[in-house]
UniProtKB/Swiss-Prot annotation:
It comes from Candida dubliniensis (strain CD36 / ATCC MYA-646 / CBS 7987 / NCPF 3949 / NRRL Y-17841). Keywords: Membrane, Mitochondrion, Mitochondrion inner membrane, Transmembrane, Transmembrane helix. Required for assembly of cytochrome c oxidase (complex IV). GO terms for biological process: mitochondrial cytochrome c oxidase assembly. Its main location: mitochondrion. The gene is COA3. Belongs to the COA3 family. It is a single-pass membrane protein. This is Cytochrome c oxidase assembly factor 3, mitochondrial. The chain crosses the membrane at residues 33-55. It is found in: Mitochondrion inner membrane. The lineage of its organism: Eukaryota, Fungi, Dikarya, Ascomycota, Saccharomycotina. Residues 56-88 are mitochondrial intermembrane.
Length: 88
């Protein structure tokens, strides 16, 4: 196994060795890909956003009226209310 010392050759021209900030050369290298990457970001992020909005709309339209509620006696209801008040 070889030793790795320092940054790989050729990569030091893209960062300032003292401040480690991006140099104008790296901006020039990245420039052709900026708009393509931006469009890809919007395309990929629109899929989960569309799923979320569709689900939110469908759940908002549902009144849940078709779900049967089991009958409960008045005695049982009073017991549950008492338990609820005691838990507070």
């Amino acid at each position: 196994m070889g030793k790795l010392v320092g940054a790989p050759k050729g990569h030091d021209r893209y960062r300032d060795p003292k401040t480690h900030q991006i140099t104008p050369a790296l901006y020039r290298v990245r420039a052709p890909f900026f708009w393509r990457n931006t469009i890809a970001l919007f395309a990929v992020s629109s899929i989960p956003l569309a799923v979320y909005l569709y689900t939110f709309k469908k759940m908002g339209d549902d009144d849940l009226g078709d779900i049967p509620i089991p009958p409960i006696s008045d005695e049982e209801l009073q017991k549950l209310k008492l338990e609820y008040e005691n838990q507070k």
